[in-house]
Amino acid sequence: YDWAYCQFKQHNFSQALDGFSRYVSVQTGGNRSMLADAYSRIGDCYYYARRFADAEQYYARAQETDVANGDYALFQKAFMAGLQRNHERKIELLDKLIVDYPRSGYLANAWFEKGQAYTILNRNNDAIVCYKQLIADYPQSAIARKGGLQLGMVYFNNGQTDESVAAYQQVIERYPTSEEARIAVADLKSVYVEKDAVDAYANYLNSVGRSEQAPVSELDSLSYMAAERTYMTGKGIASLKKYVRNYPSGAFLIPANYYICLLYTSPSPRD
């Protein structure tokens, strides 16, 4: 057992697997906690070898051997189900973890992974519930930051752009120095372009002290992109005229004015 752990700590997973397998083959009764731990480590070794079905089998043995301390094994069992694309089974096992181990240290991860499974299944409303629960219950956890990003993405994919903006802004304001905040700024940009509200994006970045992440040249490009998108969807030229007005020396004045002229000279001009 100790030799196997030494191999495991050194990432020699093949040797560790051999050691733990020999340990469980001769262990009869005795310390069930150690036996369950060995089963979990065998599961880990199979996981690192990408033998997910075998890993799931040994995590199940670990959880059954020491039920009272089986939250890690149950979480990993659910994770293996997801890696095998059995997302419904993954959700079922995570629900069991949440109910059976209400004080587990893996609950934050369980809510996140459950949200991921629902997202893959295109059950966006269920995913939203999971990410919101994660953020509400574990706001200071690292996984909550990732959950906030996922929440913004799912809202956006759901066509709920206002909610998406709020989710990304929460990540930026609650975790300002994090990598997730930097990603949220970039993702928020796409939402504001979709909303044709680049000015609001610039104003928001100024309000939270991140104006350096949106230089004038980028705002020029984003404003034109949003205006062109509006034009291409048949919604008139108001956004193009606004771009020309706000960026009199803009990099896209020629195509913007061209589109405006096209609309004014069309048989049924649109404003």
Language-model features: locations:
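Acidic, polar-rich low-complexity tracts and alpha-helical solenoid repeat scaffolds
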Residues: Y1-S266, R270
